[in-house]
Amino acid sequence: MSWRSEYIWVEFIAGSRKPGNFFWAFILFLGSLGFLVVGISSYLDRNLLSLFPSQQINFFPQGIVMSFYGIAGLFISSYLWCTIIWNVGSGYDRFDTKEGIVCIFRWGFPGKNRRIFLRFLMKDIQSIRIEVKEGIYARRVLYIESRGLGAIPLNRTDENLTPREIEQKAAELAYFLRVPIEGF
């Protein structure tokens, strides 16, 4: 999603709150909870989960391994839920031609660098760069080449833009900023 006027262009960046992340965090939570309950059931020798009779799963070694997988899955699931709650990776890119300033903001993990904020002058922008890697894991990333800061990515690497979409986005941004386009 973006917003544009004559002098200002704001590009909003989606973070971790995507349907796929919700789906995998939920599935991982349920699966790891199931493993943990089966492991505890085998230890107590009681049916806490009525799908499997506890006598069929020995605590050593199957119950211990299932408990370990359940605990590990709960840790990974809690990590995914934290990234969703904190909305890691979301933010905006603001290009202001009237003031000649570019602001790039992203939310990170809690701590000293929770707010990632880059602010630099438009005259420091050398070009817009498109990096395309084809293959099984194809990725197309749009960068701003800047003096002093190097290449700054503008879109997420997991954003699956078609070649036409990435070229159009690069052309519009290059025209708005009045800089050349480089391709890789």
Curated annotation (Swiss-Prot):
Membrane topology: Multi-pass membrane protein
UniProt keyword list: Chloroplast, Membrane, Photosynthesis, Plastid, Thylakoid, Transmembrane, Transmembrane helix
Compartments, as annotated in UniProt: Plastid, Chloroplast thylakoid membrane
Single biological process term from Gene Ontology: photosynthesis
Spans through the membrane: 20-40, 64-84
Major location (coarse): plastid
Pfam families found in the cross-reference section: Ycf4
One term under GO cellular component: chloroplast thylakoid membrane
Taxonomy, superkingdom: Eukaryota
Family: Belongs to the Ycf4 family.
UniProt function note: Seems to be required for the assembly of the photosystem I complex.
Protein name: Photosystem I assembly protein Ycf4
Organism name: Citrus sinensis (Sweet orange)
Lineage start: Eukaryota, Viridiplantae, Streptophyta, Embryophyta, Tracheophyta
